[in-house]
Every structure is written in C-alpha cells, then in structure tokens.
C-alpha cells in the first residue's frame, strides 16, 4: 500500500511540472521568432520597423491586371519622392529603407544657403512633402499645413480689352506677368482652363526649380530617384542625402543605386 501511494504521488508531481516545461518551451520559441522578424524579409525586400513588415525594394511592381496605383484619401498625401500610398496599412510607405540615409560628403563644395540635414547625423530628417503639406510621423503621411488658408494666387482678368481678338491675347499675357511681385515667375497652373497661374520663385522652388514645370521648364527636385533630402539652389537641384541603398553622386545632383 505504501509503495502504491508513492507511485501516485510521483505521478501527480510529474503532471504538475509538465505545464511549466511546455510553457517555457513555447516562450523560448516565441522570443526567437520575434528576434528574427527583420531577417525574415527576402533579398528583394527590406524591413520597415514602423509597421513591422517587409516591403518590396523600389516599391510595388505594376500589377498584371493594370490595377491603378492607390491614391491617398482626401486630406492626406505622400511625399512625391520615394513614397507611395498603401490602402491596407492606411499610410504612406517608403520604396527604400529610411533608417540610414547617405549624408552629403563633408568635402562637397555646395554654395547653397540651405543647412544640410547631414550636419546632424544622429537624427534622420523627415520626408519632404509638397508645398502646403506637412509630414506627420505618427500618421506616416502628409497633411495640409495649418492653418489652412484659401489660395491667394492672383488671377488674370477675364475682361478683354477693346480691340480685336489678337490684341486681347497679347494684352492678356502682358497683364499676367507683371501681376507677380518682382523676382517671381508667373507659372500657369496645370489643368486650369481659366488661364490661372501662380507666382513662384523658380530659383528656390523645389517642384519648379529653374523654370515653370507646368510648361515643361526647370526640374522637379522631388522626383530625383533615391533622394531623401533635396533643395533648389539658384535654379539648380541639389541632393543633400539619399535613401539607404543609394549613394550621392560626385556632383551632388543625383543618387546612384548601389
């Protein structure tokens, strides 16, 4: 009888220990899996820690079904260079890693008055949104700058001068140019059927650097592939830093894929 009691006691003790051993094993496996999250991405992907996911290097490839690229909802937009909207994540996602942008070499002889973000390598500069938009890190997208104000863009008069039609067209153009303050260019607004235009300083305007982009002049600095932080210096685009996976060109005007 005594032997029987001892056997029963040992059996109960063994059953009590098993759950703890199993729990420890599961916990160990979970921790190991979590620590390898960034290593689970394929060679054609990179890890984006802000959303804890793998993203395709260079952005999503065009769908074989020709599905249109998702566009941000009203009130949101993505930086024009290196970012795209993702409906599933409801935010903007980068086309390349964002954690280690390549800074401008200290030997570069830029004459720009802009302060290069690479002067503080410990902090990564935020993505550059289009004019009138600000980057919100918590939302991973651009939102309208506040306070939001109606556009004060001057518009040419719709009332024709007396005389024939040819005279009106010449006068119409003549009035449009002087309407902008000295030093600004009157750039037609793309898609406008009313002849509207905006006054831009094309010597420093990122999206119309060196000329009005709406008429095919100048350069859109925000469209430089691989560029993280750019500027427009006296009508010429300057690249200050690049996304990870790119290096700055020797002349500081583009980013070269590694």
Swiss-Prot record:
Range of residues in the leader sequence: 1-23
Listed Pfam families: CPL1-like (PF21671)
Keywords assigned by UniProt, alphabetized: Signal
Keyword Protease: no
Region (Disordered): 102-128, 145-166
Listed transmembrane segments: none
Record carries keyword Amino-acid biosynthesis: no
UniProt biased composition (Low complexity): 102-122, 145-156
Matching PANTHER family: APPLE DOMAIN-CONTAINING PROTEIN, PROTEIN, PUTATIVE-RELATED
Function, in words: May play a role during the beginning of fruiting.
Name of this chain's protein: Protein priA
Organism for this UniProt entry: Lentinula edodes (Shiitake mushroom)
């Amino acid at each position: 009888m005594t032997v029987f009691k001892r056997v029963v006691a040992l059996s109960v003790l063994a059953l009590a220990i098993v759950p703890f051993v199993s729990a420890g094993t599961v916990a160990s496996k979970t921790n190991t899996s979590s620590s390898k999250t960034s290593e689970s991405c394929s060679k054609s992907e990179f890890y984006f820690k802000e959303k804890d996911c793998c993203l395709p290097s260079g952005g999503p490839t065009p769908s074989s079904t020709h599905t249109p690229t998702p566009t941000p909802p009203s009130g949101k937009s993505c930086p024009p260079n290196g970012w795209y909207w993702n409906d599933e994540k409801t935010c903007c996602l980068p086309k390349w890693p964002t954690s280690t942008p390549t800074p401008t070499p200290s030997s570069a002889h830029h004459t720009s008055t802009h302060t290069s973000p690479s002067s503080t390598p410990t902090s990564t500069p935020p993505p550059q949104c289009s004019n009138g938009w600000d980057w919100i890190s918590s939302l991973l997208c651009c939102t309208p700058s506040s306070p939001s104000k109606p556009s004060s863009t001057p518009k040419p008069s719709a009332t024709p001068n007396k005389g024939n039609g040819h005279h009106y067209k010449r006068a119409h153009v003549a009035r449009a140019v002087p309407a902008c303050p000295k030093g600004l260019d009157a750039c037609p607004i793309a898609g406008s059927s009313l002849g509207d235009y905006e006054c831009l300083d094309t010597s420093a305007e990122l999206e119309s650097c060196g000329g009005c982009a709406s008429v095919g002049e100048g350069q859109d600095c925000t469209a430089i592939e691989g560029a993280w932080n750019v500027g427009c210096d006296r009508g010429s685009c300057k690249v200050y830093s690049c996304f990870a996976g790119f290096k700055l060109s020797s002349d500081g005007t583009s980013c070269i894929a590694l």
